């Protein structure tokens, strides 16, 4: 995971005719994530997709036309090819760094990383970031994100204006959890993050649909439905105990059942559905602080 620059991008202002990017890529094997990991660079202006250009294996240069507009422009990378940007040059006009926006730490699993989205820019956190003017730090860990204490400590140590937590499906399989173990881990995770960010809104999203796991016990006897119930119960308990800046979003019905090509990860449309449901909640949490107003 550390070798894949999930969510790394370049945001800039200005109206150049184009930008040129000198780059180096390490691999053409996109692994289990597949084509959605990206084989191209692409520029967005605000939330409008602009020109894309294929990346080569090894060293190369790509030129991309940049559409005009007042919104920040964003260059997304071919993440799965493990790119390094060597240089970026504007043509036909100057560019400058985009203004700072509220910093959002988005912790989750491969769903947050963007698996089965059409491209890295199509992962639901990046759609939300563009639409809600947030500076997202994508902490999506494929095959992991089981509420590890080390991750909670890292989140607690980083500057943030908003934090989100969305994990659970990998606690049904891979490293199976019972409902009680999952609940204890989530509570510890939330306590550590809250200690580091006493006033920052935290949006907790319980596991989204996974048809094969909903009613099927894992090795410790827990169905995904049991883990989801435990997730929501822990968040509600923390709210009742005085965490007034903790938000709960039940995840079960956020994505339609036919939007999971591999049974686990939402497709491109499913990521749009997640962004549509979660974007306003994240914005509201940032602006209002407390779900109780």
How would you describe each model-predicted region?
Residues 25-27, 110, 142, 169, ...:
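Residue-level signal for short, function-critical loop segments
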Residues 1-104, 279, 283-293:
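N-terminal secretory targeting modules
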Residues 6, 107, 139, 167, ...:
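Short glycine-rich loop/turn motifs that provide flexible caps or phosphate-binding loops at active sites
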Residues 74-159:
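Serine-esterase "nucleophile elbow" of acetyl-processing enzymes
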Residues 57-66, 80-85, 115-128, 158-172, ...:
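Short, charge-rich amphipathic segments
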Residues 21, 107-108, 205:
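Short hydrophobic segments within beta-strands
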Residues 9, 116, 262:
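Conserved aromatic-histidine-acidic binding/catalytic patches
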Residues 3, 13-16, 149-293:
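Alpha-helical cap/lid subdomain in secreted, periplasmic
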């Amino acid at each position: 995971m550390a070798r894949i620059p999930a969510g790394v991008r370049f945001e800039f202002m200005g109206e150049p005719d184009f930008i040129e990017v000198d780059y180096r890529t390490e691999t053409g094997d996109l692994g289990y994530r597949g084509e959605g990991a990206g084989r191209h660079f692409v520029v967005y202006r605000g939330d409008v997709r602009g020109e894309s250009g294929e990346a080569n294996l090894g060293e190369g240069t790509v030129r991309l036309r940049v559409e005009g507009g007042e919104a920040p422009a964003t260059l997304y990378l071919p993440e799965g090819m493990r790119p390094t940007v060597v240089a970026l040059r504007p043509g036909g006009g100057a560019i400058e760094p985009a203004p700072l926006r509220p910093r959002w730490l988005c912790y989750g699993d491969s769903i947050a990383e963007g698996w089965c989205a059409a491209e890295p820019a199509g992962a639901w956190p990046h759609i939300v970031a563009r639409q809600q003017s947030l500076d997202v730090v994508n902490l999506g860990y494929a095959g992991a994100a089981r509420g590890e204490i080390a991750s909670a400590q890292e989140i607690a140590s980083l500057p943030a204006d908003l934090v989100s937590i969305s994990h659970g499906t990998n606690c049904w399989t891979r490293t199976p959890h019972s409902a009680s173990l999952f609940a204890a881990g989530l509570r510890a995770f939330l306590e550590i993050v809250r200690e580091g960010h006493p006033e920052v809104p935290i949006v907790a999203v319980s596991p989204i649909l996974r048809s094969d796991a909903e009613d099927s016990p894992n090795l410790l006897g827990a169905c995904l439905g049991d883990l989801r119930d435990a997730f929501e119960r822990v968040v509600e308990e923390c709210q009742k105990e005085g965490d007034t800046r903790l938000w709960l979003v039940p995840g079960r019905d956020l994505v339609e059942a036919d939007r999971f090509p591999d049974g686990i990860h939402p497709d491109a449309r499913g990521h749009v559905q997640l962004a549509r449901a979660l974007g306003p909640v994240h914005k509201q949490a940032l602006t209002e602080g407390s779900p109780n107003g």
